[in-house]
Design a protein with these regions (language model features):
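A short glycine-rich, Lys/Arg-flanked "PGG" loop and its adjoining helix->strand segment in the class I
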Residues: 119-131
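Conserved beta-strand signature within the Rossmann-like core of class I S-adenosyl-L-methionine
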Residues: 132-140
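Conserved class I S-adenosyl-L-methionine
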Residues: 1-36, 49-50, 151-153, 158
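Short alpha-helix
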Residues: 163-179
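A short acidic, Gly/Pro-enriched loop at the edge of an enzyme's catalytic core
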Residues: 92-104
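Core SAM-dependent methyltransferase catalytic element
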Residues: 183-205
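Class I SAM-dependent methyltransferase SAM/SAH-binding core
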Residues: 39-94
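A short SAM/SAH-binding and catalytic strip from SAM-dependent methyltransferases
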Residues: 103-117
Length: 205
């Protein structure tokens, strides 16, 4: 279902996201890739909004299950350049070998995955991340502030209809079972957007 949504909205996606991209997301993307090097997976690359922030000298693979979104990413890559491979595949079964990547990054990916898909997706990312590597996940959550939470609840039906996304995913809950140890969780925008940093638990990925 989500794949079909993104096939449908791909040509409008950047326009729909433009106010948030300019006012909120761009600084967060810098944080997401800060200090990373080597082989990096951008899981859920979408239209390629992260491409300008890929670390110099790194080899990045961007994956997405929507050909239409990847087409937009390819156009952006052609303008910007870089050592980037774009591949159509599913985060639940990427097709990569064990221990392939030094780092795995996912920005606003897990909020579009149903609750039942959280664990298998995390397990797959843990499998393809090197034991010495790390996984960084940028995600929304409901605010603890009653007023902000109320506003987010008003927005939630539209966000679910347009993007297949939700603010109520319990991604962190599944990490230990997926073979991941949470290293750090911190908010990057108020108390609604956080970055979760995790690493494979030795012998469990």
């Amino acid at each position: 279902m989500t794949k079909h949504k993104y096939q449908r909205i791909a040509r409008l996606y950047d326009l729909l996201d433009l106010p948030f991209e300019r006012g909120r997301y761009r600084p967060l993307r810098r944080h997401l890739f800060e200090g990373l090097s080597g082989r990096i997976l951008d899981a859920g690359v979408g239209t390629g909004r992260n491409i300008p922030f890929y670390p110099a000298g790194s080899r990045v693979t961007g994956i997405d299950q929507s050909p239409a979104m990847l087409e937009r990413a390819a156009r952006r890559l052609a303008r910007i350049g870089g050592d980037v491979e774009l591949r159509e595949t599913n985060v639940l079964d990427t097709g990569f070998s064990d221990d392939t990547f030094n780092a795995v990054v996912a920005s606003f990916l897990f909020c579009v995955l149903d609750e039942t898909l959280q664990l298998p997706a995390l397990h797959e990312l843990a499998r393809i991340c090197k034991p010495s590597g790390e996984i960084r996940i940028l995600e929304y959550r409901y605010s603890d502030n009653p007023r902000k939470r109320f506003i987010m609840r008003l927005w939630a039906p539209w966000v679910r209809w347009a993007y297949g996304a939700g603010f109520d995913r319990n991604t962190e809950h599944y990490m230990p079972e997926a073979g991941l140890e949470i290293v750090e969780t911190r908010f990057l925008h108020e108390d609604i957007i956080k970055i979760i940093t995790a690493r494979p638990i030795q012998g469990q990925s």
